[in-house]
Curated annotation (Swiss-Prot):
Signal peptide: 1-20
Lumenal side of membrane: 21-286, 384-386, 448-460, 532-541, 602-613
Cellular compartment(s): Endosome membrane; Golgi apparatus membrane
Cellular component, GO, one term: trans-Golgi network
Predominant cellular place of this UniProt entry's protein: membrane
Cytoplasmic membrane side: 308-362, 408-426, 482-510, 563-580, 635-652
Gene: TMN12
Source organism per UniProt: Arabidopsis thaliana (Mouse-ear cress)
Motif (Endoplasmic reticulum export signal): 641-646
Pfam families associated with the record: EMP70
Keyword annotations: Endosome, Golgi apparatus, Membrane, Signal, Transmembrane, Transmembrane helix
Residues spanning the membrane: 287-307, 363-383, 387-407, 427-447, 461-481, 511-531, 542-562, 581-601, 614-634
The name this protein goes by in its record: Transmembrane 9 superfamily member 12
Family, as annotated: Belongs to the nonaspanin (TM9SF) (TC 9.A.2) family.
Domain notes: The C-terminal KXD/E motif functions as a Golgi retention signal, certainly through the binding to the COP1 coatomer.
Length: 652
């Protein structure tokens, strides 16, 4: 009992440590009074379509120097981010209201596009000093926080749409304190430490907050066209009357203006992301973890009782008998002892099993390392795309582990290393091939919609080059190491003639599929938060909780697979290899079913067949990765359990 308590205290400590250690993820910038700062704009996004589009696909004001794209990493490109410069200029600690531009009369295509983006709830995502714009809204007396602001709005009981053309910005600044320790991170500008000389020069203000209030204001277009960009205009209050708002219709000219207010804040630069990463539902996370711990300890208790009282008792009784008595006992008794000559017989499709286990080891390693680094703060949300980039890099370099695990299992099953090169190539191509097919199909859908989420052809070639130059050689090298590693020797000999398996009243696969409910019970609450982050545009930064859930999932998968394997051996079913894999891997089936449930009941606003196909495609890819990872955990645990179990049996 004391051991259980210590484990629980350790998990609490790890969670608090992971949540407390935070790296903001970018250089600290200080600005002097009057310094110009230009906002950037990311792709337009919507929770209704999940199809990102370029900001300048709509008739917005363009900067005087022209549109310039920011350098993007691999993760940003895959996520569909397209960060451009914008015309919105801010001057440090200068409160002002400025004119931007007036469009030409809207044509039919522009009106149709603006109305469509408005009704599909598209959001404009603006960034200042690497901080997304925050918007606060009240619903039923509760203040709700959003990132970005809508393209426009459609009043109820009206066929008209109105565009957001006036923005009221509030920029929170903190006076630079030279004695505050800076934090290293990885933002878009790179990585570095502020030197003492730079500290003395960097007298000024840090931007620690960026808020926006969107408005729709009807202007006299003829009068406003006489102004130039950044000319001052009177400050306005957001009108509530529709006749004072800017309607979207043909031949209308839309004037864009904005105003900015700088406000001093006590928030310091290392804490400026706290407003975005407020932990919601912490009690729900802890309830999920405690519930999972109860399941784990209950299941572990059953496992230990079975093994200590049944397995050890049988082994002790078996070893105390002489050879004649053992032979007589084998004829009289049934159970796992009777399959001693078949338990290590080569399974069907053994090559496919080795391939899936090899790739499963790689995916598991990638997930564990990524979540550990994220929990420690090395993959900050300030560094857009770094999480996905890190996962891809880890996957590529862990090819050496995949090749080693797959080939060593192949050598164990076959008794020879012959064919290891073909197996290593298959491991290198298996999951990337599945991902390539799914992403290519989805990419055609994105291309047909002119979405920025479509993967460019150049990126396809870059990914192919990374795979061929890093993943394939490392997988082959890992396979070579697997051929040189000491072979795992089976403790018993395999009979030439397979033993007949007794008929069962119900299919054994039914029990295997049902076993996935226990790992899913550990995972499903965290799945809700992850899905909400991906599909509803919310920040997910509770990696401390996710790390604990991952560790619990590993334990549950191992326990479930071992119990199912033992149950099959007890009924003289020696074909345990694939069943051990799918006993824990079947959790992927429930994850995919949950994703469909989430689509139907939580993403009711998702519209159009393209959006639904994108959602299902990405969910399917995630489920396959989960199946390979959890199946591998269960299989390897069962393999070592069976090896240990039968190594205790004395056989001539």
């Amino acid at each position: 009992m004391f051991g259980v308590y210590r484990v629980f205290v350790l998990l609490v400590f790890v969670s608090q440590l992971c949540n407390g250690f935070y790296l903001p993820g970018s250089y600290m910038h200080t600005y002097s009074d009057g310094d110009s700062i230009f906002a950037k704009v990311n792709s337009l996004t919507s929770i209704e379509t999940e199809l990102p589009f370029s900001y300048y696909s709509l008739p917005y004001c363009q900067p005087l120097e022209g549109i310039k794209k920011s350098a993007e990493n691999l993760g940003e490109l895959l996520m569909g981010d397209q960060i451009d410069n914008s015309a919105y200029r801010f001057r440090m600690r200068t409160n002002e209201s400025l004119y931007l531009c007036t469009t030409s009369p809207l044509n039919e295509h522009e009106v149709k596009l603006l109305k469509q983006r408005t009704r599909e709830l598209y959001q404009v995502n603006m960034i200042l000093d690497n901080l997304p714009a925050l918007r606060f809204a009240k619903q039923n007396g509760v203040t709700i926080q959003w990132t970005g602001y809508p393209v426009g709005y459609s009043p109820p009981n009206s066929n008209d749409d109105y565009i957001i053309n006036h923005l009221k910005f509030k920029v929170l600044v903190h006076e630079y304190e030279g004695n505050v320790m800076e934090v290293i991170g990885t933002g878009e500008e790179g990585m570095g430490v502020i030197s003492e000389a730079d500290k003395k020069k960097a007298l000024g203000y840090e931007i620690v907050g960026f808020e926006v209030v969107p408005c729709s204001v009807k202007y006299d277009a003829e009068k406003m066209t006489k102004l130039h960009m950044y000319d001052p205009v009177p400050s306005v209050n957001c009108p509530l009357e529709l006749d004072k708002a800017q309607i979207i219709k043909e031949h209308e000219r839309i004037t864009f203006t904005y105003e900015v207010e700088f406000v001093k804040s006590e928030t310091r630069w290392p804490s400026r992301w706290d407003a975005y990463l407020k932990m919601e539902g912490a009690r729900v996370h802890w309830f999920s973890i405690l519930n999972s711990l109860m399941v784990i300890f209950f299941l572990a208790g059953i496992v230990f009782v079975i093994f200590l009282r049944t397995v050890r008792r049988d082994l002790t009784k078996y070893e105390e008998l002489d050879k004649e008595a053992q032979a007589q006992m084998n004829e009289e008794l049934s159970g796992w002892k009777l399959v001693v000559g078949d338990v290590f017989r080569e399974p069907e499709m053994s090559k496919l099993l080795c391939i899936m286990v090899g790739d499963g080891v790689r995916i598991t390693g990638m997930a564990v390392v990524t979540i550990v680094f994220a929990a420690l703060g090395f993959m900050s949300p300030a560094s857009r795309g770094m999480l996905l980039t890190g996962m891809i890099i880890l996957y590529l370099f862990l090819g050496i582990v995949a090749g080693y695990a797959g080939v060593r299992l192949w050598r164990t099953v076959k008794g020879t290393s012959e064919g290891w090169r073909s197996l290593s190539w298959s491991i290198a191509c298996f999951f990337p091939g599945i991902a390539f097919v799914i992403l290519t199909v989805l990419n055609f859908l994105l291309w047909s919609s002119n979405s920025t989420g479509a993967i460019p052809i150049s990126l396809y070639f870059e990914l192919l080059a990374l795979w061929f130059c890093i993943s394939v050689p490392l997988t082959l090298f890992g396979g070579f190491l697997g051929t040189r590693a000491e072979a795992i020797q089976f403790p018993v000999r395999t009979n030439q003639i397979p033993r007949e398996i007794p008929e069962r009243k119900y299919p054994s696969w039914l029990l295997v599929l049902g076993a996935g409910t226990l790992p899913f019970g550990t995972l499903f609450i965290e799945l809700f938060f992850i899905f909400s982050s991906i599909w509803l545009g919310r920040f997910y930064y509770v990696f401390g909780f996710l790390l604990i859930v991952l560790l619990l999932l590993v334990v549950v998968c191992a326990e479930v697979s071992v119990v199912l394997t033992y149950m099959h051996l007890c009924v003289e079913d020696w074909r345990w290899w694939w069943k051990a894999f799918y006993a824990s891997g079947s959790v992927a089936l429930y994850v995919f079913a949950y994703s469909i449930n989430y689509l139907v009941f939580d993403l009711q606003s998702l519209s159009g067949p393209v959006s639904a196909m994108l959602y299902i495609g990405y969910s399917l890819l995630m489920a396959i990765a989960i199946m390979l990872a959890t199946g591998t955990i269960g299989f390897l645990t069962s393999f070592y359990f069976v090896h240990y179990l039968f190594s205790s049996v004395k056989i001539d």
